[in-house]
Amino acid sequence: MAAQRRSLLQSEQQPSWTDDLPLCHLSGVGSASNRSYSADGKGTESHPPEDSWLKFRSENNCFLYGVFNGYDGNRVTNFVAQRLSAELLLGQLNAEHAEADVRRVLLQAFDVVERSFLESIDDALAEKASLQSQLPEGVPQHQLPPQYQKILERLKTLEREISGGAMAVVAVLLNNKLYVANVGTNRALLCKSTVDGLQVTQLNVDHTTENEDELFRLSQLGLDAGKIKQVGIICGQESTRRIGDYKVKYGYTDIDLLSAAKSKPIIAEPEIHGAQPLDGVTGFLVLMSEGLYKALEAAHGPGQANQEIAAMIDTEFAKQTSLDAVAQAVVDRVKRIHSDTFASGGERARFCPRHEDMTLLVRNFGYPLGEMSQPTPSPAPAAGGRVYPVSVPYSSAQSTSKTSVTLSLVMPSQGQMVNGAHSASTLDEATPTLTNQSPTLTLQSTNTHTQSSSSSSDGGLFRSRPAHSLPPGEDGRVEPYVDFAEFYRLWSVDHGEQSVVTAP
């Protein structure tokens, strides 16, 4: 096992070795690439995607999840995802380990990954130094004679290979206890279902220039914490902890803001939170990259992104039939909110000219999935046909919640028609307005599994169906509870009827 791990750490030629690791099917991932908007609202990708993620289950029933947010390229994020898996899933963790052992293994894993990456670029750094020594001193690059162009091109290639860094949030689930290790600005949330709603807790802290503990750490190294907080950015990033980024690791003495430091000010040492016991917990774990919550904060303002995203996930749990679909639906929704805010030209539009890559990982702990989804896919409409909705309320004696199921009838067209979709409410209407800004907050769940009425916003589409059997009327018939009114209305409109036919 040790030889296998050394082989993995020494080789850059096995980028897909983790394909052989079993995936965790109790989790799902959604993602979206970065976007910059032009004046006409069109979005284009500013750079290749730089996020990465992992969700594995080892043979000894240890679960590993991670979301990695890169910058200046994706080499570091890919490296970290590969090497952390090697450091944590090749026998280093097992059920006999105590909490202190797990924390020690996590600290050691991050240390090995950081050192391994910096060692992996040693040759490139040496070549860069050698090439730079061949250039005439004091001459700007754009003024160099043509014979130096090949050297300049090689230097640019080397710079791309060695530049960049990554932030990481990692979760380990072992012996039904949750551990979170964090470097940088990605976030981990634990969302628990309670009698009062959904309790949302951020498990880690953001390592930024706004973090008072981080500012104190930097001040102990001899740096001006007040100036760092005022500037807010260190070499292009708000984070005070990063993996990689050789410029701030090796060259911090040449950076005005960091030059007075007694030792490396930007570190890759993780803060570890846990163990968090999960016995009896119903809910879900959230790992998300900085790009996701920053995009939502840009559109809605700071302070409530955690709660809003948790509420969105809760809503999608009721609608989707897979965890990947849950995560992707939330990412798509945040992306749409951000885009719509920019296009609106409103007060928040100036904060939304672009967003970074967005990644969301959701791990389920027994939270009900797909209660509002149709049990089987609707049949595809025939060519040229149109879908007409028929609404049927659903009631279960085993649940006090009420869920609406919308069936679809496909009718042949008498000409060219565009398939229509009709919804009684928008996704955004399901998100509650929140005012509490504490790290732990209880939301009134939109996906209530005990007391809510999720069909209440559907208005007149649904007739109330009592739980008990209805007695027959004088004509021996039971009052219908299937409402065809919307079906007949749309049929009449499409076929040129002057009056809407009422349901029988």
From Swiss-Prot:
Region (Disordered), start-end ranges: 1-22, 430-478
PTM section of the record: Phosphorylated at all three sites Ser-423, Thr-431 and Ser-438 by MAPK14 when cells were exposed to cellular stresses, or stimulated with TNF-alpha, IL1 or LPS. These phosphorylations inhibit TAK1 activation by a feedback control mechanism. Dephosphorylated by DUSP14 at Ser-438, leading to TAB1-MAP3K7/TAK1 complex inactivation in T-cells.
Modification Phosphoserine, positions: S7, S378, S423, S438
One GO CC term on file: protein-containing complex
Annotated positions of the Phosphothreonine modification: T431, T442
Tissues showing expression: Ubiquitous.
Amino acid composition bias (Polar residues), ranges on this chain: 7-17, 430-439
Locations listed in the record: Cytoplasm, Cytosol; Endoplasmic reticulum membrane
Primary location group: cytoplasm
Organism per entry: Homo sapiens (Human)
Annotated protein name in UniProt: TGF-beta-activated kinase 1 and MAP3K7-binding protein 1
Required for interaction with MAP3K7, annotated site positions: F484
